[in-house]
């Protein structure tokens, strides 16, 4: 595929992500300026998205806004990922008990991906966008997911993740294996100052998988607050995990059509 086609595809998705952030109508000039696109490219992309039914154009005000077709692209995904809803309930339970940012993470090749997040209610907090990825070696959730693999697979992933990581953030295999041994012994992962300086994360494995993959239920926030509340936060995570255990007969959602 030509690089120009790749760039156009990326920009089309960036426009949709842009509307997710601003959540209001925008003119072509505002979109082009905010995303640093040439106006000619923005015009073509917007017209294409209109023709495909993903954007509405108000000719009187000369502004654009997404259509429900954008929502339809992914409205089926949460049910496929989270099944009967126990995972989402577990997230809400932890959020209610701690007020901290909560997320579910899964492996995506050599990366950790945050597939669902709930924002912290504390004044001092860190923001995390759903869909964000980072190398598995660069977060407590990633370490926890690595701990579910054989040592040979961990070796392979660490080497590949290091290739995708800046030199100053690469990890030595023996250091990673020591971390993973501790995680396997304790049954949970804790990380401080990684990936965010001054932040701390606490993670446990969910009993249910997401699309057949192990999933981590985590909370993250200011390190000092986490150190002061470590036991309470860990208890909240473990209680949520116990509540998320799903009987075998309920693993697969049943669709009933009338």
Locate the predicted segments by residue.
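Amphipathic alpha-helical regulatory segments at dimerization interfaces
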Residues: 34, 45, 86-97, 103, ...
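N-terminal helix-turn-helix
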Residues: 1-80, 242, 246-247
């Amino acid at each position: 595929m030509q690089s120009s086609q790749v760039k156009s595809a990326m920009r089309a998705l960036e426009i949709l992500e842009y509307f997710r952030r601003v959540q209001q109508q925008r003119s072509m000039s505002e979109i082009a300026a905010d995303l640093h696109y040439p106006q000619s490219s923005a015009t073509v992309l917007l017209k294409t998205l209109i023709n495909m039914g993903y954007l509405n154009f108000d000719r009187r005000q000369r502004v654009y806004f997404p259509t429900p077709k954008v929502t339809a692209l992914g409205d089926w995904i949460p049910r496929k990922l989270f099944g009967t809803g126990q995972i989402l309930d577990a997230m809400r339970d932890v959020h209610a008990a701690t007020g901290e940012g909560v997320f579910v993470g899964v492996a995506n090749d050599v990366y950790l991906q945050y597939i669902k997040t709930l924002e912290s209610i504390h004044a001092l907090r860190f923001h995390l966008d759903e869909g964000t990825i980072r190398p598995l070696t660069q977060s407590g959730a990633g370490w926890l997911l690595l701990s579910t693999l054989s040592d040979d697979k961990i070796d392979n992933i660490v080497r590949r993740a290091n290739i995708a990581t800046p030199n100053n953030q690469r990890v030595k295999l023996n250091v990673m294996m020591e971390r993973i041994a501790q995680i396997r012994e304790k049954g949970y992962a804790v990380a401080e100052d990684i990936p965010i300086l001054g932040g701390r994360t606490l993670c446990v494995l969910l009993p249910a998988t997401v699309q057949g993959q192990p999933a981590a239920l985590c909370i993250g926030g200011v390190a000092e607050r986490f150190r002061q509340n470590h036991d309470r936060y860990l208890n909240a995570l473990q209680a949520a995990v116990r509540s998320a255990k799903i009987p075998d007969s309920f693993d697969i959602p049943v669709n009933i059509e009338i």
